[in-house]
């Protein structure tokens, strides 16, 4: 599971996530990428599940890059606890993802294998995603959507 080695502050406010992603929205390392089409928090468990889905499908071939990192702590108070008494303890870590963000990249495999591996990774994530090639970058309009809600 991914989490920071150390942070300046233990707890963080929720914050807001308006607009599109202006950073990390190009396929840089690999040939194919998985682009987020919705804003969301992606937990470290979901990132790990998607990574396992990709590596399990491509077997030994290919290289995978994880372009997001869970650096935001999410706190939770124990069950059946009354209001007040301060903020709860850190429960898990999330990565804040905006639309247009490339979350995973893949190289060294055939196009059909890469598309299927990234489609399987998209099934593990709580948002709609789009598989893109390095050539078709910057196309947020009319996406060929891969939804995790289907099936």
Curated annotation (Swiss-Prot):
Cited SUPFAM superfamilies: Ribosomal protein L16p/L10e
Keywords: Ribonucleoprotein, Ribosomal protein, RNA-binding, rRNA-binding, tRNA-binding
BP term (GO), one: translation
Gene3D superfamilies in the cross-refs: Ribosomal protein L10e/L16
Entry GO MF terms: rRNA binding; structural constituent of ribosome; tRNA binding
GO CC term, one of those recorded: cytosolic large ribosomal subunit
Pfam family, one: Ribosomal_L16
InterPro entries attached to this UniProt entry: Ribosomal_uL16, Ribosomal_uL16_bact-type, Ribosomal_uL16_CS, Ribosomal_uL16_dom, Ribosomal_uL16_sf
Family label: Belongs to the universal ribosomal protein uL16 family.
PANTHER family: 50S/60S RIBOSOMAL PROTEIN L16, LARGE RIBOSOMAL SUBUNIT PROTEIN UL16M
SUBUNIT field: Part of the 50S ribosomal subunit.
Described function: Binds 23S rRNA and is also seen to make contacts with the A and possibly P site tRNAs.
The name this protein goes by in its record: Large ribosomal subunit protein uL16
Gene that produces this protein: rplP
């Amino acid at each position: 599971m991914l989490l920071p080695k150390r942070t300046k502050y233990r707890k963080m406010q929720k914050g807001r996530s308006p607009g599109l992603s202006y950073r990390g929205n190009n396929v840089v390392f690999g040939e194919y990428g998985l682009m987020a089409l919705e804003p969301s928090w992606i937990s470290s468990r979901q990132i790990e599940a998607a990574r396992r889905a990709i590596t399990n499908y491509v077997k030994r071939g290919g290289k995978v890059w994880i372009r997001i990192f869970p650096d935001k702590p999410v706190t939770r108070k124990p069950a059946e606890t009354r209001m007040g008494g301060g903020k709860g303890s850190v429960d898990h870590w999330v990565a804040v993802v905006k639309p247009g963000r490339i979350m995973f990249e893949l190289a060294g495999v055939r196009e059909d294998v890469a598309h299927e591996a990234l489609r399987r990774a998209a099934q593990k994530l709580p948002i709609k995603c789009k598989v893109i090639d390095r050539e078709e970058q910057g196309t947020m309009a009319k996406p060929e959507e891969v939804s995790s809600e289907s099936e």
